[in-house]
Amino acid sequence: MSEVAELAAFREEVRAWLEANCPAEMREPVRDESDMCWGGRNARFKNEAQKLWMERMAERGWTVPDWPTDYGGGGLSPAETKILKQEMARIGARNPLMSFGISMLGPALLKYGSEAQKKRFLPEIARGEIRWCQGYSEPGAGSDLASLQTRCEDKGDHWLVNGQKVWTSYADKADWIFCLVRTDPKAPKHKGISFLLFDMASPGVSTKPILLISGSSPFCETFFDDVKVPKDQVVGEVDKGWDVAKYLLGHEREMISGMGLGGQTGSLGEAFADLLADDPILRADMARFDVDAMAYRAMSERFIDELKAGMAHPAQPSMMKYAGTELNKARHELVMAAGGSNALEWESDRSKKGKA
């Protein structure tokens, strides 16, 4: 059988499996954070369908379809992974598991982690059994991240961590943290940094949610006071954590570029076809947007392939983030132009029930 025929057969298999196994509730647009499944040891599911969808996908290894099967993945090729995503988009299937472990830490562990670290953490990430947060930014180290000052001292049989992180997304809900710490304070600022993993339930770890003007608190201040961490929880080499951090940031931007269209996969022109017949200007604007969206998706796929092959230009992640943000802004403006003030209401007919 040719490769084309094999992929066609795989598509049919995926389509049939998704139709049989994706609950109807998981084929609706994500309206708020409660519609997202984050997993973790204290996971809260909005309904049984959300839990069932995550478990079924994890059993197939399709929460992380391109990871090796030895680590809980599906072992799919890039072409097969693309087909899976296309077929999920075709029926409007939700992402079964939102996870910084999947989008950021996992790729870094696959590249830099020890075999013991991979076997310990990756299957738990794939099954949604562990929720991670990212300990990068500090009060004095934001855009200049390498200026971080969180201290990590070698105490012989363990590391001792003291310091503070800020803007730590969902730190108050996370089970573990991947954290940048300074292990050599005398080294140049990009040196002497190590990439450390530790349990957020460790003695000495505390969090303080940051209240935003919206009333929500997705970010936290995170404090470390004499936190003891086992020696084998450094990823990569001691004092060379900056390499791991940069690699991880590339995958974080991959995740962000994938969100550039706000999770929407359909055509605006098709969604608003009933409103466009008498408005040639709006019809042309939406057609132009749909073409731009197709180009962005193609560019995003190319970027992801180059990133995984180690061929991405250093400026590409930032370029994708900027392009995606501008495109998503244009989408919202067009939805408002088509639906008027009624489009502000997520469930309204003019907002296409959140599908536009």
What are these regions (language model features)?
Residues 1-99, 120-127, 257, 279-287, ...:
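Amphipathic, small/basic residue-rich leader segments at the start of a protein or domain
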Residues 5, 204-298:
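Glycine-rich beta->alpha junctions and the first turn(s) of the following alpha-helix
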Residues 7, 18, 61, 68, ...:
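Buried hydrophobic positions in well-ordered alpha/beta secondary-structure cores of metabolic enzymes
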Residues 28-32, 280-283, 294-355:
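C-terminal helix-coil-helix/basic helical segment that borders enzyme active sites and/or dimer interfaces
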Residues 128-136, 180:
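A short, Trp-centered hydrophobic/proline-enriched beta-strand micro-motif
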Residues 144-162, 348-355:
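Cytochrome P450 C-terminal beta-domain/meander region
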Residues 149, 157-158, 162-208:
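A short core secondary-structure module
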